[in-house]
Amino acid sequence: MDKSPEVLLELVERLGNLLRAEFRRAGADEQLQPVHVHALVYLTRANRYSNTPQAMAEYLGLTKGTMSQSLLLLDRRGLIERYQDDLDRRVVRLRLSTSGEQFLYDAQPQSAWQHATRNISPNRIRNAVSALRETLTTFQADNEGQPFGSCSGCRHFERLSARAYRCGLMGDRLSGPETRKICWLYEEKGAGGEEEEE
């Protein structure tokens, strides 16, 4: 088996191209581009600190202008809703509308991936996730990109009890489902100059 990083790159590129084709197919009936479908999927995965145009643009690697145009189109199609932050009225937040949720349910843009990985053992999936996560983390650090991640791996995550959680950075209580969503305030445990306890 070839173990070179170049083969990994070729495989990731090929998978990315195939997934883009799936996202293009998923959006075809609504005349949406893959970037629009990616934006909708992002909103299903983003937590309350990450559902802003700025965070979405960072995650998707888009310019402010491209993101703005994409959101205008999704808003006009009734697939997203914009609302003001409760604490800071200057901040615009985004969420899927009922139509947006229905679109993703009907289109199932990730079903091809689920089908393709159905026979891979959980252990092999874990190993692949670990290798790809390490590659992504290094790539983002080298390019000064925002890492994004879920609460359980974040240095700000505080477990108050078996079912009570808190974001130490923002000071907010978190629900169980929230702790599994992605956050752009994420900092890997041990990051930021703090030593991890042994």
Task: Give residue ranges: language-model regions.
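Terminal interaction helix/tail motif
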Residues: D106-R155
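Basic amphipathic alpha-helical segments that dock to polyanions
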Residues: L40-L43, M56, M67, L71-R77, ...
